[in-house]
C-alpha cells in the first residue's frame, strides 16, 4: 500500500499533465507532502510560497481569478489555525476555483489536539 503523501504527489503530477492550467502552491513542505513530485514534473507551475499561510490563500485566489487552477499543499494544522479566515472570506465566499490539500491531520500522523490546542 502506498503512503498517502505519495498518492498526493502522484495525483498532483497526473493533474498537472492533464491540464496546463493546474498550479501547485506549497508552504515550504514539498518534501513532507510529496508535492516535490509535481515540482520535478512541472517546475514552471510549482510555486514555493514559504511560511505565510494567509498570503498563500490570497495568491491562490488571485491566480484562480485569471484562469489558473491552484492546488494548495500544506499541513492541516496550518489551514485550520492560520488560514481559516482567508479560506472563508477569499475562497468560500467568492466561490474561487482553489483546491485545498491538507496533510497530516489527526492522531495517526502525530498531530493530536493536545499538540495544537
What are these regions, as identified by a protein language model?
Residues 1-117:
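Thiamine diphosphate
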